[in-house]
């Protein structure tokens, strides 16, 4: 998958990086081409969290990026999805937990309802999972908190939302 950009963590002091996490993430579309977003609200080691984020999660050993995305969307959100395109890779860092992230983004569509099996930390952190028209999703990101982990998510995903908008525009023109 093509590396789109790399981002540095300017919110937490750098000490060292001791692990890399591969993460599959998706811009999940419903029949109206609305985008599925998770609303994150919590206070934890990262500080105050109040932002939106695409669903996804870590890739397990012997699991492809595509398999990881499909599994994570069902577990976190309760949807069965079909991947329709790749967007690209975005690498970033979470200095606070000494981690380098390789985020692999896909576009997928909902094809059914599955079994949601959230982890306890996801139940605590994810306050809402809902679909949003693309322009509304962009506005939500533009108005997100501009500090701490919310800023890191915003700088990682807002450019991708604009790419998804362009993708949907081109798709509608066909």
PLM ranges: what are they?
Residues 30-33, 109-114, 134-136:
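Short loop segments at secondary-structure junctions
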Residues 57, 71, 84, 132-135:
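Structural detector for helix-capping/boundary residues
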């Amino acid at each position: 998958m093509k590396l789109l950009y790399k981002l540095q963590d300017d919110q937490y002091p750098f000490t060292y990086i001791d692990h890399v996490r591969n993460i599959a993430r998706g811009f999940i579309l419903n029949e109206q081409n609305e985008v599925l977003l998770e609303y994150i609200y919590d206070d934890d080691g990262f500080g105050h969290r109040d932002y939106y984020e695409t669903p996804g999660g870590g890739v397990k050993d012997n699991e492809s990026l595509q398999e990881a995305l499909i599994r994570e969307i069902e577990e976190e959100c309760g949807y069965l999805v079909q991947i329709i395109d790749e967007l690209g890779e975005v690498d970033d860092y979470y200095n606070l937990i000494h981690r380098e992230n390789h985020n692999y983004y896909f576009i997928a569509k909902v094809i059914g309802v599955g079994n949601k099996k959230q982890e306890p930390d996801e139940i605590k952190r994810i306050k809402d999972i809902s679909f949003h028209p693309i322009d509304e999703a962009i506005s939500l990101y533009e108005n997100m908190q501009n500090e701490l982990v919310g800023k890191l998510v915003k700088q990682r995903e807002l450019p991708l939302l604009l790419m998804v908008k362009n993708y949907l525009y081109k798709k509608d023109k066909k």
